[in-house]
Amino acid sequence: MNVFLSKYVNGVDKKSRVSVPANYRAVLGKELFNGVIAYPSIRNNCIEVCGISHIEKLRQMTETLDPYSEERDAFETMIFGEAVQLSFDGEGRVILPQSLMKHAGIEEQACFVGKGVIFEIWQPQNFEKYLNAAQKIAHEKRLTLRNAH
């Protein structure tokens, strides 16, 4: 399967290393880079994570915007300018940069959340708060999904 699914909570050690769930690594197995691209989410206080192929799609999307627009500049700065390549070690761990950990409020635990073509890394309690709000929105907007095709 080529989508990121499910939710996992893993510990973060004193060196800021965290194990990426094995099934997430399996999805990334087809990528040219043995690791992930991570950047601060522009929607939530979390880290968005993807493979090189998704970053290329984001690049193509930003290139459709006016090259001198504030929007394009902001998106490119926040996504590409803040993105970091994180390589997997022999145990499937990555080292989370302090800037990303601070953005997400991550200290001792990280919550991995599959979102289809990307996954997010949250501070677990912050994700639970978000999940409660998301459940309400999903319930209220459920017909939108049915009408999407």
UniProtKB/Swiss-Prot annotation:
Primary location class: cytoplasm
One Gene Ontology biological process: negative regulation of DNA-templated transcription initiation
Quaternary state and interactors: Forms oligomers.
Domain called SpoVT-AbrB: residue spans: 7-54, 83-126
Similarity annotation: Belongs to the MraZ family.
Keywords: Cytoplasm, DNA-binding, Repeat, Transcription, Transcription regulation
Any GO CC annotation of this UniProt entry: nucleoid
Matching HAMAP family: MraZ
Molecular functions per Gene Ontology: DNA-binding transcription factor activity; transcription cis-regulatory region binding
Naturally occurring in which organism (per UniProt): Rickettsia peacockii (strain Rustic)
Name the record gives this protein: Transcriptional regulator MraZ
